[in-house]
Design a protein with these regions (language model features):
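Extracytosolic ligand-binding ectodomains
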Residues: 1-248, 300-301
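Composition-driven recognition of long, low-complexity, acid-poor segments enriched in small hydrophobic
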Residues: 228-298
Length: 301
């Protein structure tokens, strides 16, 4: 997430960023990766501050950040700190944009941040269900079977279980010592993506989706990361399906028109043949009459 969020910051048109993390493994790791990506993308990190996962008063570090005139504040941490931090930024008159990871992409963040959460950005792993190539089909099957609306992580949990089942099948064992190594060789076409893992066990090409708080709810902004390719594939697949459907419709119409034209041509040919017969008959009659008239004239002389 940190890498993708660093790249997203550049797209926001900012040039300076301040970074705060809560010193937890999650928060610090996220902030460190964000910093690397931000600097690699040409952004200037004007402040790096730290707090902890129990704090609720951030005015001291935010006052320092305000003096740097940072255009964006990135927070590596959870909603319990992120919400109050966003609220205190507003109270201090800090105009910088606020950005965080999935730890602040929660209803609790909105509750704690109140009006100050409006316009802030956060991220969640994966893509929205409607953006997944197999998402609509999964939703339909899920609601039909369970009679309930699908939950956010349902397709990812489903794929996780199916990856384990696939690994057990390939290892021919349900013993963890035997099937866990097989997970590393996974190549599974799941609901969420084509699932493969790198040498350290991370998901290859994992997509990250960006959301923004608007009017008390999260709104999807865009998807970044390797699996954004899957998003493009889904769009292409949909376009191909539409083209195929249109082509079939055209072919069907052409066939119908062809049959109609053929039928009309057959009728015309039949009419022409009958007219030809009548013409030949009339011609023969005329020749016969002419012959008789000639004979009568000769006999008269």
């Amino acid at each position: 997430q940190g890498k993708v969020l660093g790249e997203f910051s550049v797209k926001q048109g900012v040039k300076t960023v301040a970074i705060v993390d809560d010193r937890t493994a999650y928060g610090q790791g996220l902030a460190d990766e964000f910093k690397k990506a931000a600097e690699a993308s040409g952004l200037k990190v004007v402040a790096t501050e730290y707090t902890n996962d129990k704090a609720t008063d951030f005015k001291a570090i935010l006052t320092k950040i305000k003096s740097t005139k940072a255009e964006l504040v990135f927070f590596g941490g959870m909603d319990a700190q992120g919400g109050p931090m966003a609220k205190q930024m507003k109270e201090l008159g800090i105009k910088a944009k606020f950005l965080g990871g999935d730890g602040v992409c929660t209803p609790e963040f909105m509750k704690l941040g109140g009006e100050a959460s409006e316009g802030n950005f956060c991220s969640l792993p994966g893509m929205p269900l409607e953006k997944l190539a197999k998402g609509p089909e999964f939703r339909e099957k899920f609601t039909k079977k369970f009679g309930a609306e699908i939950q956010l992580y349902a397709p990812y949990v489903y794929d996780a279980v199916m990856v384990m089942a696939d690994s057990m099948k390939r290892a021919d064992s349900v013993e963890p010592a035997k099937f866990l190594p097989a997970i590393g060789q996974t190549r599974y076409d799941g609901v969420t993506a084509l699932i493969e893992f790198d040498s350290v066990g991370d998901l290859k090409g994992g997509a990250i989706s960006i959301y923004q708080y608007k009017s008390g709810k999260l709104e999807y902004v865009e998807t970044l990361g390797g699996s954004a390719v899957d998003l493009a594939k889904a769009d292409v697949k949909e376009a191909v399906a539409e083209v195929k459907e249109a082509a079939q419709a055209v072919a069907g119409a052409a066939t119908a028109v062809g049959k109609e034209v053929a039928a009309e041509a057959k009728d015309v040919a039949k009419s022409a043949a009958e007219a030809g017969k009548d013409a030949v008959k009339a011609g023969a009659e005329a020749v016969k009459n002419a012959a008789e008239a000639t004979k009568a004239a000769v006999e008269k002389k």
